[in-house]
């Protein structure tokens, strides 16, 4: 029997906003960090939560998502004040983040602004993207945090606005359900039933080949498009271009 200790930190951030073009974090700041410690699949209660003064205004669109006002942040610490405590908390752990590129991008950007030669997060933490995992488990389905809560029957009724600590706590429950195996049989059977039903009812129509040339997006273009939609959906709660 293995006695190895597995330490995971389920993490979420809220920010002043994001860029639609270029690096999504450039010129923006983290204003809230919420993190939940999980050791050997048990929530320990050793959480990390802080609000941060960004020294810039919160974009109206971002305020509409998380409801964190500029006035509320005026007396909060800046990132430099908490960075050492934060690094001590996450160092060596596996970070579980929904759409990890968003939060890791911001974290590495904030580290870089300090001019302290702090290395990239993925050099001292393993990073697991729960959104990527969900897409592998449920291809073609909605895999936002709210959608996963509904799928796994996890209560998210308190999530009227996005908040980093609440979202991290909810994601911890979702991730444990996704990786715990208790409900995997149900969803596997559900998917197999749907597949079999689909095979029985789909009628295939043979069409004559079209003379029109069809131009497909390259793999790089598709990846860039999906990455941008991920960012929109993570911070907006929904995405018009996804069903």
Curated annotation (Swiss-Prot):
A divalent metal cation 2 binds at residue 12. The DNA polymerase holoenzyme is a complex that contains 10 different types of subunits. These subunits are organized into 3 functionally essential subassemblies: the pol III core, the beta sliding clamp processivity factor and the clamp-loading complex. The pol III core (subunits alpha,epsilon and theta) contains the polymerase and the 3'-5' exonuclease proofreading activities. The polymerase is tethered to the template via the sliding clamp processivity factor. It comes from Salmonella typhimurium (strain LT2 / SGSC1412 / ATCC 700720). It is an enzyme of class 2 (transferase). This is DNA polymerase III subunit epsilon. One of its GO terms (cellular component) is cytosol. DNA polymerase III is a complex, multichain enzyme responsible for most of the replicative synthesis in bacteria. The epsilon subunit contains the editing function and is a proofreading 3'-5' exonuclease. One of its GO terms (biological process) is DNA replication proofreading. The lineage of its organism: Bacteria, Pseudomonadati, Pseudomonadota, Gammaproteobacteria, Enterobacterales. Keywords: DNA replication, DNA-directed DNA polymerase, Exonuclease, Hydrolase, Magnesium, Manganese, Metal-binding, Nuclease, Nucleotidyltransferase, Transferase. CDD domains: DNA_pol_III_epsilon_Ecoli_like (cd06131). It catalyses: DNA(n) + a 2'-deoxyribonucleoside 5'-triphosphate = DNA(n+1) + diphosphate. The active site is at residue 162.
């Amino acid at each position: 029997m293995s006695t190895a200790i597995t330490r995971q930190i389920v993490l979420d951030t809220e920010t002043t906003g994001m860029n639609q073009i270029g690096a999504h974090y450039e010129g923006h700041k983290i204003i809230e960090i919420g993190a939940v410690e999980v050791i050997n699949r048990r929530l320990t209660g050793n959480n990390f939560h802080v609000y941060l003064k960004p020294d810039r205004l919160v974009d109206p669109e971002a305020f509409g998502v998380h409801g964190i006002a500029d006035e509320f942040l005026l007396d909060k610490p800046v990132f430099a004040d908490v960075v050492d405590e934060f690094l001590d908390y996450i160092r060596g752990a596996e970070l579980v983040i929904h759409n990890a590129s968003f939060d890791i991008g911001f974290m590495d950007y904030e580290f870089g602004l300090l001019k302290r030669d702090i290395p990239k997060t993925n050099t001292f933490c393993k990073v697991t993207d729960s959104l990527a995992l969900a897409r592998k488990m449920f291809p073609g389905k909605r895999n936002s945090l709210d959608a996963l809560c509904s799928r796994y029957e996890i209560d998210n009724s308190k999530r009227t606005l996005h908040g980093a600590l609440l979202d991290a706590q909810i994601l911890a429950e979702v991730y444990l359900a996704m990786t715990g195996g208790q409900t995997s049989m149900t969803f596997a059977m559900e998917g197999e039933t749907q597949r079999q039903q689909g095979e029985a009812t789909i009628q295939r129509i043979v069409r004559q080949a079209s003379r029109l040339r069809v131009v497909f997006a390259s793999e790089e273009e598709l990846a860039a498009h999906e990455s941008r939609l991920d960012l929109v959906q993570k911070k907006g709660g929904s995405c018009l271009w996804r069903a």
